[in-house]
């Protein structure tokens, strides 16, 4: 006899078989061990890219190191001077420094005296950056953190006597900005690197004593959201032990679930292997790539590091920067914009102005940028000035030139009975009509002083196909 038949209560409700099956499947998934990646590109390249990176869209790159002391030519100063012996660099040194002055003598002058990480982080936040990438070590080998394998050539032993990497990371994370660490695999003049080079990179003295210990240290110490590798081009990934490091990073590191890496892990890797593609500096594809990519570029068109001989014609304009940002995001990329601080840790006003202008633009148009996806059409037909993005069922048309007649003509969107059209930064709906030449949008009659932004306006279209 059933318990409820003798007055012990009603029968329990029947549990649907489907619910039991779903519960069982969930328990199996929960019990299943996480996928592990083997140290080969087929396995590593199959790892899904963490969502945060594609949603971020815009980041700030910071090139900062010993090269900010001479601050002349570019961040490749040491190589141009001693590696290539370029006459203009030799002349610069002879005119400005005493005989026998070495590159290491710049060390004490790299003071970072006015470096206030919270000030930097506030600026980057105001710029609308969702991630920031700092050079932990450029090709010169000087590390911006107390690396135990860079004795007397790091920011704790020489110059600032501070952990620059750690300080900036703490400031950024207080503002929920993702933190990326740039790291150069090679060092131009390190004795062990030169020894491996002499041996045609058949030995790995430098990799085992310097490169790999530093990468593991950076990950365990700072838990970065992104590792921006560089300096790979002389050697294959097998010399750098890249796949071994990345398999550890994806399987066992403290950042295994959210870390993102680029594609510079060996001379055979760029644009072929990695978490996302940089390909080369200032890479700009002509059509929508199959995989996630990032355009890295610099406000100073000539140099990544700060240089005192920069002139205004070398500086990217606000219009140029916004245009590149829009085109990059429309084609599915992220836009990483570089600035170079001074040896004192200051970000010069022209760089601040450019960053703040982007932040102002994004405060109005960010809806069309952050977390967007490429639409079925990226560039409006027969034009170079209208680019599309999308979020769900909403389409955004960003136009870079205001039509003289005040009417924007679009051929790609197909209207429906539910179509609504607005401009970001303007509260009311816009008038529109469909004509044989396409969708005609009648832009608001506003002065330059009442427009939401001065350049790059966004039309929001809902209910279109």
UniProtKB/Swiss-Prot annotation:
* Keywords from the named record: Glycoprotein, Glycosidase, Hydrolase, Lipid metabolism, Lysosome, Signal
Molecular function in Gene Ontology: alpha-L-fucosidase activity
What is this enzyme's class at the first EC digit? hydrolase
Coiled coil ranges: none
Entry's EC annotation: 3.2.1.51
Give the GO biological process terms.
Answer: fucose metabolic process; glycoside catabolic process; lipid metabolic process
| A family per Pfam | Alpha_L_fucos
- Disease linkage: Defects in FUCA1 are the cause of fucosidosis. It is a lysosomal storage disease characterized by accumulation of fucose-containing glycolipids and glycoproteins in various tissues.
Assembly information from the UniProt record: Homotetramer.
The protein depicted here goes by the name: Tissue alpha-L-fucosidase
**Species of provenance:** Canis lupus familiaris (Dog)
Q: What is the lineage of its organism?
A: Eukaryota, Metazoa, Chordata, Craniata, Vertebrata
UniProt lists the gene as FUCA1
């Amino acid at each position: 006899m059933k318990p409820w038949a003798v007055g012990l209560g009603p029968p329990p409700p029947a549990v649907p078989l489907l619910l039991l099956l779903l519960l069982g499947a969930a328990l199996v998934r929960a019990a299943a061990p996480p996928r592990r990646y083997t140290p080969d590109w087929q396995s590593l390249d199959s790892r899904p890219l963490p969502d945060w990176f594609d949603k971020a869209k815009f980041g700030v790159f910071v090139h900062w190191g010993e090269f900010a002391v001479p601050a002349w030519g570019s961040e490749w100063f040491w190589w141009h001077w001693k590696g290539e012996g370029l006459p203009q660099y030799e002349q610069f040194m002879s005119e400005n420094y005493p005989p026998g002055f070495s590159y290491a003598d710049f060390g004490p002058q790299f003071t970072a005296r006015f470096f206030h990480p919270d000030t930097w982080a506030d600026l980057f936040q105001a710029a609308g950056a969702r991630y920031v990438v700092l050079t932990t070590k450029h090709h010169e080998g000087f590390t911006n953190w107390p690396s135990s394998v860079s004795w007397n050539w790091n920011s704790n032993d020489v110059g600032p006597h501070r952990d620059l990497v750690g300080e900036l990371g703490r400031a950024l994370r207080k503002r929920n900005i993702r933190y990326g660490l740039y790291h150069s695999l090679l060092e131009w003049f390190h004795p062990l690197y030169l020894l491996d080079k002499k041996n045609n990179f058949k030995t790995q003295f430098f990799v085992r004593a310097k490169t790999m210990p530093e990468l593991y240290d950076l990950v365990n110490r700072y838990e970065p959201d992104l590792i921006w590798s560089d300096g790979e081009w002389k050697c294959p990934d097998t010399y750098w032990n890249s796949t071994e490091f990345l398999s550890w990073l994806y399987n066992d590191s403290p950042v295994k679930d959210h870390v993102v890496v680029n594609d510079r892990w060996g001379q055979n890797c760029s644009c072929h292997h990695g978490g996302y593609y940089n390909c080369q500096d200032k890479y700009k594809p002509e059509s929508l790539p199959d995989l996630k990519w990032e355009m890295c570029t610099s406000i100073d068109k000539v140099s990544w590091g700060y240089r005192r001989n920069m002139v205004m014609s070398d500086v990217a304009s606000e219009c140029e920067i916004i245009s590149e940002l829009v085109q990059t995001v429309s084609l599915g990329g992220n836009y990483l914009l570089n600035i170079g601080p001074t040896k004192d840790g200051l970000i010069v006003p022209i760089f601040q102005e450019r960053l703040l202008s982007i932040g102002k633009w994004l405060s109005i148009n960010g809806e069309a940028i952050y977390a967007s996806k490429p639409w079925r059409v990226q560039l409006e037909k027969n034009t170079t000035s209208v680019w599309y993005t999308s979020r769900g069922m909403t389409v955004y048309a960003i136009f870079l030139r205001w039509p003289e007649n005040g009417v924007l003509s679009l051929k790609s969107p197909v209207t429906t009975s539910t179509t609504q059209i607005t401009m970001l930064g303007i509260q009311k709906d816009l008038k529109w009509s469909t004509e044989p030449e396409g969708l005609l949008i009648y832009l608001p009659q506003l002065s330059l002083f009442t427009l939401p932004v001065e350049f790059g306006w966004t039309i929001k279209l809902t209910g279109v196909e």
